UniProtKB/Swiss-Prot annotation:
Gene for this chain: rex
NCBIfam families: PRK05472.1-3, PRK05472.1-5, PRK05472.2-3, PRK05472.2-4, PRK05472.2-5
Pfam families registered for this protein in UniProt: CoA_binding, Put_DNA-bind_N
Transmembrane regions: none
Residues that hold NAD(+) according to the record: 90-95
Protein name: Redox-sensing transcriptional repressor Rex
Top-rank taxon, per record: Bacteria
Chief site of localization: cytoplasm
GO cellular component assignments: cytoplasm
Length: 211
């Protein structure tokens, strides 16, 4: 399927649509309206119609969207038939939680290897995932052809580890550290800062109290 260039905001919403369509399909529903989708995924219906418009005519005016057809389409767009192996770098408290989770509700993503400096866990299998020593990082990432990694190392090691991952061919990094990483233009970094997100939530709640 030809790659379609879409806005980043649209790309982030596609998995939301796909997950809800899975639910509808399991319930045996044949069609869904943009209004129903809007209420379920908390995205306004105008944005949904605009998102879908990037892919051509996916629905019919007055009818809505065929659930099976839409599900099949987004399955291809999101590569749901292709298994993506992801590396976890750093097996501390957050890393262990991610290992235990390991995208169990996803059919196409899995953490296939993990790395840490702790000799008590390296060389072992945790939650079904082999944990390697950080000294083996570049070799294993290259040998296993891993292109996506989750980074949960201490801040002091974040940039150094990133440089090693990039050298090994990693092209996508989900960064859970508070450090803003420096990476080549062809490497995409997605920052996940839980503390910042919570602080933002607290700010908005406090603002609503004042009003």
């Amino acid at each position: 399927m030809e790659k379609i260039k879409i806005p980043k905001a649209t790309a982030k919403r596609l998995p939301l649509y796909y997950r809800y369509l899975l639910i509808l399909n399991e319930e045996g529903k044949d069609k869904v309206s943009s209004t129903e989708l809007s209420e379920a995924v908390q995205v306004d219906s105008a944005s949904i119609r605009r998102d879908f418009s990037y892919f051509g005519a996916l629905g019919k005016r007055g009818y809505g969207y065929d659930v099976k057809n839409l599900l099949s389409f987004f399955k291809k767009i999101l590569n749901q038939d292709t298994l993506t192996n992801v590396a976890l770098i750093g097996v501390g408290n957050l890393g262990r939680a991610l290992l235990n989770y390991n995208f169990k509700r996803s059919n196409n993503i899995r953490i296939s290897c993990a790395f840490d400096i702790n000799k008590e866990i390296t060389g072992r299998i945790l939650s079904g995932v082999p944990v390697y020593d950080m000294e083996d990082l570049k070799q294993q990432l290259s040998d296993q052809q891993i292109s996506i990694a989750i980074l949960t190392v201490p801040s002091t090691a974040a940039q150094r580890t990133t440089d090693e991952m990039v050298d090994a061919g990693v092209k996508g990094i989900m960064n859970f550290t508070p450090i803003r990483l420096s990476a080549p233009a062809d490497v995409r970094v997605q920052n996940v800062d839980l503390a910042t997100e919570l602080q933002t939530l607290i700010y908005f709640l406090d603002s609503e109290k004042e009003n």
